[in-house]
Structure formats: C-alpha cells, structure tokens
Amino acid sequence: MERDVEDEQVSRDHSPGRATIGPGFASVLVAAQTGAPWALERLYHGFSPVVLGYMRIQGAADPEDLTNEVFLGVLRRIGSFEGDEEKFRSWIFTIAHSRLIDDRRHTGRRPHLAEPHDYHWDRAGGDAEQEALERLSSQRVQALCEGLVADQRDVLLLRLMAGLTVEAIAEALGKSEGAVKALQRRGLANLRKILERDPVSL
C-alpha cells in the first residue's frame, strides 16, 4: 500500500531523452536511501535510459555494462546524497563521465561517436544556434558532433542529451562554469560553420 501511495506522487514521464521523476522525487530518494527495492527500481528505470544512451553515443565498448557500473556506484553512495532531482542528475552524470573516462583509459579506446541511432534529444533551451541544433534529428547531431574536439562534444552532449545546466556540466566534467560556457560557445560556433558548409533542413 505504501508503494502505491508513493507511486502516485511520481511523474510517469520517463522519455529516454530526459530522466524525470517529478514532484515525488524527494519521497523516492528517501525510500531509496533506506533500501526500498521499489524506490531503487524507480530511480534506475527513470535515469538509466539516458545514461545508456550517453554511453552508446560516446562509443563506449560495452555501454550496458558501464551503465550497470554507474548504478552500482549510485547504490553504494546514495545514502550520502543530498539534493533535488537536478542535483541527482548532475551527480549521476558525474559518475557516468568518470566511468567513461576510466573505461577509455583501461581499454585504450579513443573518444569516438557510435553509429547513429534515433535517440531523443533533451530540450535544454539556450540561444538561437542551440535551439536550431535541437531541431535537427539525433542522427544528424551525432554526425555533426563527430567533427568537434572531445571537450566541446562532451559539453554539448551533456547539455542536449542529458539536459544538464552549465553548473551541473561543470561539476560533472570537473571544469569551471566559465570554461563550460566557452566550450559550449565554441562548439556551437563550429557546428554552425559545419551547417553553413553542409546546410540541412531545420
């Protein structure tokens, strides 16, 4: 019965492009921190699709395995987490990016985008160039991002795919907010140049 009450408080919008628990997040978090299986399952199903998509689009050797490792890390440390849903998203992607970097270091894989898939891109908002970019198909964005340096690509994918704020991206990547803003500006400017050379219908 307790689970039914909690479930009613939770948003059912779990689109793969934006992990959303909704107004019931605080209740779900408290339950998860006490080890309630239903709450841990809710967090996993709410956030794992976008983490898996991020791993795939970043060309991880085994994206499913890395995603599972991310959530094992979340499970081990969730008792110490404090914050709202936005902070939780940032925290998860901090863990995810760290695992991705470790995987690249151990396997010797260079950053390389995966083959295009039809991922749902989050609508993070922003300036005209970013909004235009968000209207492109996910396959086209992947192809365009292939031409960016790794740091610019990481920032734009976290902004567009995960829907993180500049502050959250800075935390996830271990950079200053100013550095993230600069990378986003340069990345969008480079994408605009690519689009001017190879225009597509927006």
Predicted segment positions?
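C-terminal edge and immediately downstream basic/flexible tail or linker adjoining helix-turn-helix-like DNA-binding
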Residues: 2-8, 12, 171-172, 188-202
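Short, charged helix-capping/linker segments at alpha-helix termini
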Residues: 12, 33-41, 52-69, 177, ...
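A short, charge-rich alpha-helical start-of-domain segment used by transcription regulators
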Residues: 19-23, 29-53, 141
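Amphipathic, Lys/Arg- and hydrophobic-enriched alpha-helical face
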Residues: 43-61, 77, 145, 196-197
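Arg/Lys-rich amphipathic alpha helix in sigma70-family domain 2
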Residues: 57, 79-83, 94-115, 134
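Structural recognition of an alpha-helix C-terminal capping motif at a helix-to-coil junction
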Residues: 65-72, 86-98
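Helix-turn-helix DNA-binding module
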Residues: 143-146, 150-154, 162-179
